[in-house]
């Protein structure tokens, strides 16, 4: 074929021998070479930037040929100048897709040409995106293991030209019951899906044939991110709901800070529900986390200053956990809870059950969180640090072993109905969350924020025209303390490449929009 003379110089080349046999046309500004062959059907036209403006097709050919035979090079030129001058970029087409990708891997953002300040930029041209292989490639599932490639071609050829057909096989060479078919155009692939999807049940298959577009790299990446998120959520739920001491010590910095805020504002009423065992809430988890932190800190340090800090801190914890609401105990808790800040630096130490057992020594049975804290040893801080930790650990044992699994199950059932609801909680208990992943729904956001308290509603907003997520939503709790715990734990929480933004929803009286 022959390319017409244009302002964008075009030189087609296959080898040095062809250049020598071209009657000198390659030396012309707009020279073109005749070829009897064509590039592979899946060849990629690549855009290349950051090349010297003084370079001609000859220099570019020498740059690209080490990676494979070059079919065509087009230098982009500024037509407003006479003669047209190079814009410092070009298009190159190799005969094979493999050569183009190898050149991209070796040059893109790696090699800087003489006289240039930035490395070469090499990527598929925009025109290639509309006809990418992944847009025309089909996955065929529930295929009879007796079928071969020719059988699949015969089955799908009525819907258009097939460029590639491949059956997936195991190491033993036997079919895995699925295949990939690549058509010449996306329209052909779509026609095949409409006609063939679930159209028949093949021999040896349990369900009808599946015909759909094959997963793209983007789809695979999204699935990987979803799996990572599921693992993170599982760890979060386990740490905050099932009484895992190791997990709880990892969460204590947020809870300790929250407890300090409550005590600094003299809000003892916020803790009134701790002794009630009818339902799980975030405050009970905060108590458990703080007790675990105290035990971990005592086990990991033997310095006098640490022991002193723990003595005062564990004393206040006992008062906090006690159902006895006496004024004296409340005052003691108010005066000594300020020392919880000391525990924040120690909460990172993890401690196993065996270590706590060794630390506790002889355990005197006490129900620290189950309503049985009758002694004043913890509330007035007069008991020794080891006694206080022994009692605290006894409470953890009883609480985690007897109550927490049941309470978690009850709470889980109660909160499932919150997904999709737009019911609001009290002032200061409503959260606005954005930077949510596109694929997140109401159930996902509910599962994410359940560990911090009783959720009354969880809603992801959907665009009515596109039916796609707007990537933001609302979560409401039944109390402001749970909302603050969620903010401290989840604001900045990374999901894939995104970091969540979690903040309080503005009051209805606020004239500013959300």
From Swiss-Prot:
Gene3D superfamilies: 3.30.70.330. It is found in: Nucleus; Cytoplasm. Its main location: nucleus. GO terms for biological process: mRNA splice site recognition; regulation of alternative mRNA splicing, via spliceosome. Residues 44-127, 136-216, 429-507 form the RRM domain. It comes from the Eukaryota. It holds the Pfam family RRM_1. GO terms for cellular component: cytoplasm; nucleus; ribonucleoprotein complex. One of its GO terms (molecular function) is mRNA 3'-UTR binding. SMART domains: RRM. Keywords: Cytoplasm, mRNA processing, Nucleus, Repeat, Repressor, RNA-binding. InterPro entries: CELF1/2_RRM1, CELF1/2_RRM2, CELF1/2_RRM3, Hud_Sxl_RNA, Nucleotide-bd_a/b_plait_sf, RBD_domain_sf, RRM_dom. Belongs to the CELF/BRUNOL family. RNA-binding protein implicated in the regulation of several post-transcriptional events. May be involved in pre-mRNA alternative splicing, mRNA translation repression and stability. This is CUGBP Elav-like family member 2. It comes from Danio rerio. The lineage of its organism: Eukaryota, Metazoa, Chordata, Craniata, Vertebrata.
């Amino acid at each position: 074929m022959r390319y017409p003379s244009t302002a964008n110089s075009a030189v087609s080349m296959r080898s040095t021998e062809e250049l020598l046999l071209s009657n000198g046309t390659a030396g012309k500004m707009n020279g073109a070479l005749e070829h009897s062959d064509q590039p592979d059907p899946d060849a990629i036209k690549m855009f290349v930037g950051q090349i010297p403006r003084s370079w001609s097709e000859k220099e570019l050919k020498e740059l690209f040929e080490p990676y494979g035979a070059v079919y065509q090079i087009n230098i982009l030129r500024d037509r407003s100048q006479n003669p047209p001058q190079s814009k410092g970029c070009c298009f190159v087409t190799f005969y094979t897709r493999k050569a183009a990708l190898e050149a991209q891997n070796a040059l893109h953002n790696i090699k800087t040409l003489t006289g240039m300040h930035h490395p070469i930029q090499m990527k598929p041209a925009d025109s290639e995106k509309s006809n990418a292989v992944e847009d025309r490639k089909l996955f065929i599932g529930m295929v009879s293991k007796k079928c071969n490639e020719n059988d699949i071609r015969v089955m799908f050829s009525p819907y258009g030209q097939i460029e590639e057909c491949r059956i997936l096989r195991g190491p033993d060479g036997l079919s895995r019951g699925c295949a990939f078919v690549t058509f010449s155009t996306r329209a052909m692939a779509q026609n095949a899906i409409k006609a063939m999807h679930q159209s028949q049940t093949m021999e040896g298959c349990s369900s009808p044939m599946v015909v759909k577009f094959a997963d793209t790299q983007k789809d695979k990446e999204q699935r990987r991110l979803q799996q990572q998120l599921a693992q993170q959520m599982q760890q979060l739920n386990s740490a905050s709901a099932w009484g895992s001491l190791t997990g709880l010590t990892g969460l204590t910095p947020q809870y300790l800070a929250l407890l300090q805020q409550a005590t600094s504002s003299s809000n003892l009423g916020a803790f009134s529900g701790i002794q009630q065992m009818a339902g799980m809430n975030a405050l009970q988890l905060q108590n458990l986390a703080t007790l675990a932190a105290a035990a971990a800190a005592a086990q990991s340090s033997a310095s006098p200053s640490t022991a002193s800090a723990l003595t005062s801190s564990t004393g206040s914890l006992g008062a906090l956990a006690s159902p006895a609401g006496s004024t004296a105990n409340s005052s003691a808790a108010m005066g000594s809870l300020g020392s919880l800040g000391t525990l924040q630096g120690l909460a990172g130490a993890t401690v196993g059950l065996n270590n706590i057992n060794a630390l506790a020594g002889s355990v005197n049975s006490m129900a620290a969180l189950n309503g049985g804290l009758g002694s004043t040893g913890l509330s007035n801080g007069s008991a020794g640090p080891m006694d206080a930790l022994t009692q605290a650990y006894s409470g953890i044992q009883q609480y985690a072993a007897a109550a927490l699994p049941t309470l978690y199950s009850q709470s889980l059932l109660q909160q499932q109905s919150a997904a999709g609801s737009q019911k609001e909680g009290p002032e200061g208990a409503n959260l606005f969350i954005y930077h949510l992943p596109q694929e997140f729904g109401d159930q996902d956001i509910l599962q994410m924020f359940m560990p911090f308290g009783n959720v009354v509603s969880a809603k992801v907003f959907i665009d009515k025209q596109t039916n796609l997520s707007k990537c933001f939503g609302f979560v409401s709790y039944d109390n402001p303390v749970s909302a603050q715990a969620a903010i401290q734990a989840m604001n900045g929480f990374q999901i894939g490449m995104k970091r969540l933004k979690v903040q309080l929803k503005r009051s209805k009286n606020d004239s500013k929009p959300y």
